[in-house]
Regions:
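Anion-binding and metal-coordination hotspots
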Residues: 1-319
């Protein structure tokens, strides 16, 4: 540090008079922060110094010439789940839900919805970082179990319906989680063209898959973990080039000219659960029960517009 630091950072805000001043000050701030971090032992950095290090990694890099410069989109940026958005609140993250974006946290509200009850009672409310909604389910059920308030059926919106967490809720807490399951994300399924995974017959006992043309897979591999915390691990069945290349329906099955078709699918217990849930969700009884879930939207609306939930600071609880 030198005497010029007091001039540069003694005031909380210094508005630039010219656009070029912003770039100049950004470079100077990056150089100063880099110098400061270089002078601190890496094993003795306090939380604020660690937050500064993260912010520097997000916004600057040292190139091949050893020169510190601003990071661009081409250089890559950390994902929103780990990116620090404010030095004043290093736990806050950017959240995206549909067309809505904000910086901060998520609030998860659970309430009773008994048909014969005169009022609905809030049984759990928690503030988390903007994780996927399904990741909040285990913590919600753990807290409800601790209070003796676990329901037999938990109605949720589509953001909470991960097959992994639905199975876990049944296994660990005997809670049936009901909500719209996400559809098949593959291009073939969306465009209703070609053969997608559901067109293949899976025989778990024989560890083989049969394609719509009657060819049987040559190998069975997995389980393979996925990068998403809400996605199920996958088994992958593979066909050979000798099976796929002569097939008259090849263009409907794979877009690759060289390789053969692979089929990925979840383990038996998750696939059976998925099939059962999707069948149940087509019944009038399930649809009638699920309409009750919309009542919690009124509670969230009251929190938002009546109590300033989107602007007040809430205590955060770990799931």
């Amino acid at each position: 540090m030198d005497a010029d630091w007091a001039t540069r950072y003694g005031r909380p805000v210094r508005l630039p008079s010219r656009p070029s001043h912003t770039v100049t000050r950004l470079k100077q701030a990056g150089a100063d922060a880099h110098q400061l971090l270089q002078s601190l032992p890496s094993h003795r950095r306090a939380p604020r110094a660690e937050a500064l290090r993260q912010i520097m990694v997000q916004n600057f890099l040292v190139d091949a010439r050893g020169v510190l410069r601003s990071r661009t989109e081409k250089d890559g940026r950390p994902k929103g789940a780990v990116r620090v958005i404010s030095p004043y609140d290093p736990d806050a993250r950017q959240a995206i839900r549909g067309n809505t974006r904000w910086n901060g946290y998520l609030v998860h509200v659970t309430e009773t919805c008994d048909a014969d009850a005169r009022v609905n009672l809030i049984t759990d409310i928690v503030t988390t970082s903007p994780i996927r909604d399904a990741q909040a389910l285990p913590g919600i059920h753990t807290r409800l179990a601790r209070r003796g308030l676990l329901p037999t059926e938990h109605l949720v919106d589509g953001g909470y319906t991960s097959m992994v967490h639905l199975e876990r809720a049944e296994r660990e807490h005997q809670v049936t989680v009901n909500g719209p399951l996400p559809g098949n994300p593959t291009r073939r399924h969306r465009q209703h063209e070609g053969f997608d995974r559901d067109d293949f017959h899976i025989d778990f006992d024989r560890r083989q898959v049969t394609c719509p043309r009657g060819q049987v897979s040559s190998s069975w591999h997995g389980l393979y973990p996925t990068s998403s915390p809400t996605a199920a691990p996958l088994i992958v069945a593979k066909f050979t080039k000798g099976q796929c290349q002569p097939c008259p329906d090849r263009s409907r099955c794979t877009t690759s000219r060289e390789s053969a078709r692979n089929v990925g699918f979840p383990p038996r217990e998750l696939r059976d659960l998925q099939a059962r849930v999707r069948t149940e969700q087509q019944t009038p009884d399930w649809k009638a029960r699920y309409t009750v879930r919309s009542e919690v939207e009124g509670t969230i609306n009251e929190f938002t517009h009546g109590h300033g939930m989107r602007h007040c600071l809430l205590p955060r609880a770990s799931s």
